[in-house]
Amino acid sequence: HAVRRARLAGGERVVVMGAGPIGLLVLQVLKAKGAGWVAVVEPRAERRRHAEALGADLVLDPGAGDPSQAIAEATDGDRAGVVFECVGSPAAFAGAFRAAGKMGRIVLVGLTPESVPLNALLLLAHEKELVGSSAYTDEFPEAISLLARGLVRTAPLITARVPLERSREDGIEALLRKDDGHIKILVMPGTGGRS
């Protein structure tokens, strides 16, 4: 749904902020829909490796410097035509705003309860667009088709399988720790964790 809302043009340069489950799925759909170049910005090393393995053309660590500068260099100063903010944090929103070029579209996918600062002068002067994305049921048939044709793969996103009785300790708490590289943990009822 988010990719459709972005009105992606074939060959367009795109940035995905965040390589969690949503960001990695957006990356794959972008590649399937003909994005010309996709950069992913992600602070966690294991998630950056997943983004690279799933086809990102450039993977950046925001802790190593301002990603918008590397994006500007990689695009001869143009920056991105579309940026997907898949994190849901004020810092990621600010980074998305900087990564978008003139007349760029910033698609808000990540959720945050916090207010985010917005430089209205730059929004107007650079004619950037903010696009929200949350409803998606109309795209289920297309999503299923992308999965069936192997253009979007979910198996690489599953980084662990846990039995239902251990889902809190080995599932939820592992995801909350954010230190072990998990993307998605699959809970396996009645299997003792065996797949």
Regions found by a protein language model. Give the residues of each.
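Mid-domain Rossmann-like dinucleotide-binding core that forms the NAD(H)/NADP(H) cofactor-binding site
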Residues: 1-64, 69
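Glycine-rich cofactor phosphate-binding loops and adjacent beta1-alpha1 units
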Residues: 5-10, 49-129, 193-195
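Structural detector of well-ordered beta-strand residues that form the stable sheet scaffold
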Residues: 15, 39, 105-108, 131, ...
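Glycine-rich phosphate-binding loop at the start of an alpha helix
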Residues: 20, 45, 90, 94, ...
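Conserved acidic E/D residue at the C-terminus of a beta-strand in Rossmann-like folds
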Residues: 42, 110, 134
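C-terminal hydrophobic helical "lid"/dimerization subdomain
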Residues: 94-98, 137, 141-195
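Glycine-rich phosphate/pyrophosphate-binding beta-alpha loops
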Residues: 129, 135-136
